[in-house]
């Protein structure tokens, strides 16, 4: 355990930041799951709405250093591609 007061404070701050980061990370995952659920049931309108909300939350996570920019871009790209393929399949 930390002996100096500054080290004790740093330990407290680390615990606090860890909880906040876990909460934000969990929220991002939840929004992604909502998009995946809408894609799985084939509802393209709701999937697009859910994607726009999820995209906003993902980019907020990038801004807060929860996830990296390339990871966020990859997730958004893959979800968008799935929604786009949904539209093509439903029009045939």
Swiss-Prot record:
Q: Which InterPro entries match?
A: Ribosomal_bS20 (IPR002583), Ribosomal_bS20_sf (IPR036510)
Q: Please give the SUPFAM superfamilies that the UniProt record associates with this protein.
A: Ribosomal protein S20
Q: Do you know which Gene3D superfamilies this protein is assigned to?
A: Ribosomal protein S20
* Protein keywords: Ribonucleoprotein, Ribosomal protein, RNA-binding, rRNA-binding
Output the GO biological process annotations, alphabetical, semicolon-separated.
Answer: translation
Signal peptide extent: none
* GO MF, one example: structural constituent of ribosome
Please give the GO cellular component terms listed in this UniProt entry. Answer: small ribosomal subunit
Entry similarity comment:
Belongs to the bacterial ribosomal protein bS20 family.
HAMAP family attached to this UniProt entry: Ribosomal_bS20
Q: What does this protein do?
A: Binds directly to 16S ribosomal RNA.
Please state what the protein is called: Small ribosomal subunit protein bS20
Q: Which organism is it from?
A: Rickettsia conorii (strain ATCC VR-613 / Malish 7)
Gene, per the UniProt record: rpsT
């Amino acid at each position: 355990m930390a002996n100096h007061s500054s080290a004790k404070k740093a330990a407290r701050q680390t615990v606090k930041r860890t909880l906040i980061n876990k909460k934000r990370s969990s929220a991002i995952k939840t929004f992604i799951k909502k998009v995946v659920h809408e894609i799985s049931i084939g509802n393209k309108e709701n999937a697009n709405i859910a994607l726009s909300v999820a995209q906003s939350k993902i980019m907020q996570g990038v801004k807060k250093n929860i996830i990296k920019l390339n990871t966020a871009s990859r997730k958004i790209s893959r979800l968008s591609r799935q929604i786009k393929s949904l539209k093509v399949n439903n029009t045939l």
